Amino acid sequence: MKILGIETSHDDTSIAILENNKVVALETISQVDIFKEFGGTIPEISSREHVKNINLILEILIKKHDLSTIDYVAYTKEPGLVGTLQIGYLFANAVSLAYNKPIIPINHLAGHFYSCAIDHEINYPSLCLLVSGGHTQLMLINNPNDFQIIGQTLDDAVGEAFDKVSSKLQLGFPGGPIIDKIYKNYNGEFIKFTEPHAPGEYNFSFSGLKSQVINYYHNKIQRNEAIDINQIAASFQDCAVSYLINQTKKALRKYNVKSLVLAGGVSANSELRKRFLEISNIAIIPDLKYATDNGAMIASCAYQMLKEK
């Protein structure tokens, strides 16, 4: 079974070909460098870039692969930026019509979950910590068609909090990889920020932690005290990761699952990956090349859904 996977939910244009869930081709063009100066994604510009990039990727794939041999076309339907999702939808329909292949709409978050299935076998039921710029969720997955959210952020997503803290500390965009790099090189003591508490046993709240960090920074400025930006950034990451891990452990104690999965763009965070694997011997993390948005995870999700039928 050969599946073309198309991902355009945010600022990465990515197309992959998977054959029996093995990656045959993966081409991705990121827009991150374009939006560094803006400190975030601008949807209108992103949509225009997707139009340009999706055609560039198509040219690359056509030179190397016979698209007529594809069995299915899968694309990200939701959630994401409306305009960028539309680009992927129109492209998927064009390929479907050109080659007379069935089209499969995929939920972006389910796609992230199945990024782990490319290199690992996922046993059900599974507990997933999904962490990204737009989402922070704990999900119970009984099969490819049965996803249950048992906890989620009530305000900022963890990736959004990283971006906002990074912006306030004038470190740049995107905040996740910048702060993670600082953390890996930091050897000092951590500031003891308070781990958040949210209503609901498995929910998250990152606005309070973000405010703690920003207030600490502002107070230092107002008192004209020395500021160690690296200490503040590293301490924020330490607290954020601890919070994610502790909430996951709490859910794992209640739910009898056969696999524990880390997914989403923030799964690229080095400390989160390390601590997640330490939780349990059933823990699975995605290969770094599948951690952020990519077409392979969309095709992999479609493959799992088709297998289940």
UniProtKB/Swiss-Prot annotation:
InterPro entries on file: ATPase_NBD, Gcp-like_dom, KAE1/TsaD, TsaD
Enzyme nomenclature, EC number: 2.3.1.234
Primary location recorded for the protein, binned into one broad class: cytoplasm
UniProt xrefs under Gene3D superfamilies: 3.30.420.40
Binding annotation for Fe cation: 108, 112, 293
Class of this enzyme: transferase
Cofactor binding summary note: Binds 1 Fe(2+) ion per subunit.
Subcellular localization(s) per the UniProt record: Cytoplasm
Protein family per UniProt: Belongs to the KAE1 / TsaD family.
HAMAP family: TsaD (MF_01445)
PANTHER family tied to this protein: TRNA N6-ADENOSINE THREONYLCARBAMOYLTRANSFERASE, TRNA N6-ADENOSINE THREONYLCARBAMOYLTRANSFERASE, MITOCHONDRIAL
Stated role: Required for the formation of a threonylcarbamoyl group on adenosine at position 37 (t(6)A37) in tRNAs that read codons beginning with adenine. Is involved in the transfer of the threonylcarbamoyl moiety of threonylcarbamoyl-AMP (TC-AMP) to the N6 group of A37, together with TsaE and TsaB. TsaD likely plays a direct catalytic role in this reaction.
Protein name, as recorded: tRNA N6-adenosine threonylcarbamoyltransferase
Organism expressing this protein natively: Mycoplasmopsis agalactiae (strain NCTC 10123 / CIP 59.7 / PG2) (Mycoplasma agalactiae)
Taxonomic lineage: Bacteria, Bacillati, Mycoplasmatota, Mycoplasmoidales, Metamycoplasmataceae
